[in-house]
Amino acid sequence: MTIMRKTHPLFKIINNSFIDLPTPSNISSWWNFGSLLGVCLIMQILTGLFLAMHYTSDTTTAFSSVAHICRDVNYGWLIRYMHANGASMFFICMFIHVGRGIYYGSYVLSETWNIGIILFLTTMATAFVGYVLPWGQMSFWGATVITNLLSAIPYIGTSLVEWIWGGFSVDKATLTRFFAFHFILPFIVTALVLVHLLFLHETGSNNPSGLDSNSDKIPFHPYYTIKDLLGVLLLLMVLMILVLFFPDILGDPDNYTPANPLNTPAHIKPEWYFLFAYAILRSIPNKLGGVLALILSILVLALFPLINSSKQHGLVYRPITQFIYWIFIANLLVLTWIGGQPVEYPFTVIGQISSIMYFSIIIIFMPIANMIENDILKLHY
């Protein structure tokens, strides 16, 4: 008799995705981050569900309800900080996951890559609307500033902003709908994750060598289930150190002040994981130009499958592109730092240079390096 997991219609799907899945035998720990993102997503949905049981999406009580969760609900402080810092862990894993995709040339699996970009954007939208919910000063002003950017769209901009706000300013209607969006978006993310996996399992995983691995595959379970479990334990350890010892280190002190439309904080800035995009937005003096640059800072990732002309897969044996890649990562860190600084000299200039570098590396320098490396290969072979 055949094993049930191989014949049962439902178990068969799980079996082919997580148990008997043929996996390259040489994938390194950089491939752990996909499963870590899955763990983060499940954790965010569960903690979010329990928070939603006690949260009220009304401007008069939202701030108090979050304080009530932290003070009066059993382990409410733990759930709240796991949710807030879990979002940071989610984005750390996502940045590493995308960075690994660029380094090892995973973008050649273009369907998986493009669904990944949509996932990235959807997760950013989820985090943005979630940041508004505690209704602190930074929540309110962050929502005002970012939604106001849509007014740069010609002709329909102002109407669009008022439509999103549900009035003439960020108010009760805005908070209620943002809560609704924040509740539904993670489930849309989950659906997209399944599509992401569907496309990935059509082609199979990439591997560090960049070579075809069909001749050397091993079952996912037990080898990679154990390997992923180690990653999960490390992730939870880092998360719990954050939650239990430094719960507010990644947050903004201004968000402990209730939202006040009459008092603007000195420096309006989003959560740390948006700072690189925020720096790119601010580096362009024109409003519409800034908005376009902000959107393009993520959509530019979709160019990787199109502009890749290298004869080799990944950057393992490509020292010139490797060098450019690490400059790109350093530049991204500079942008993140600039995004959190006030708009004054020299930060504005550094931000503008870094923004130009960000796009130039992807669109100009990497393709040139590809061509040089292809020519070097021709000389040898």
Swiss-Prot record:
GO molecular function, one term: ubiquinol-cytochrome-c reductase activity
Transmembrane region(s): 33-53, 77-98, 113-133, 178-198, 226-246, 288-308, 320-340, 347-367
Keyword set includes Cytoplasm: no
Protein name per its UniProtKB record: Cytochrome b
Keyword Mitochondrion: yes
Listed cofactors: heme b
Organism: Phyllotis amicus (Friendly leaf-eared mouse)
PANTHER family listed in its UniProt record: CYTOCHROME B (PTHR19271:SF16)
Binding sites annotated in the UniProt record for a ubiquinone: H201
Binding of heme b b566, residues: H97, H196
Family: Belongs to the cytochrome b family.
GO biological process, one term: mitochondrial electron transport, ubiquinol to cytochrome c
Pfam family name, one: Cytochrome_B
CDD domains on file: cytochrome_b_C (cd00290), Cytochrome_b_N (cd00284)
GO cellular component, one term: respiratory chain complex III
Family matches, as SUPFAM superfamilies: a domain/subunit of cytochrome bc1 complex (Ubiquinol-cytochrome c reductase), Transmembrane di-heme cytochromes
Complexes and interactors: The cytochrome bc1 complex contains 11 subunits: 3 respiratory subunits (MT-CYB, CYC1 and UQCRFS1), 2 core proteins (UQCRC1 and UQCRC2) and 6 low-molecular weight proteins (UQCRH/QCR6, UQCRB/QCR7, UQCRQ/QCR8, UQCR10/QCR9, UQCR11/QCR10 and a cleavage product of UQCRFS1). This cytochrome bc1 complex then forms a dimer.
Intracellular or extracellular location(s): Mitochondrion inner membrane
Gene that produces this protein: MT-CYB
Keywords of the record: Electron transport, Heme, Iron, Membrane, Metal-binding, Mitochondrion, Mitochondrion inner membrane, Respiratory chain, Transmembrane, Transmembrane helix, Transport, Ubiquinone
Bilayer topology annotation: Multi-pass membrane protein
Other remarks on this protein: Heme 1 (or BL or b562) is low-potential and absorbs at about 562 nm, and heme 2 (or BH or b566) is high-potential and absorbs at about 566 nm.
Summary of the function given for this chain in its UniProt record: Component of the ubiquinol-cytochrome c reductase complex (complex III or cytochrome b-c1 complex) that is part of the mitochondrial respiratory chain. The b-c1 complex mediates electron transfer from ubiquinol to cytochrome c. Contributes to the generation of a proton gradient across the mitochondrial membrane that is then used for ATP synthesis.
Top-rank taxon: Eukaryota
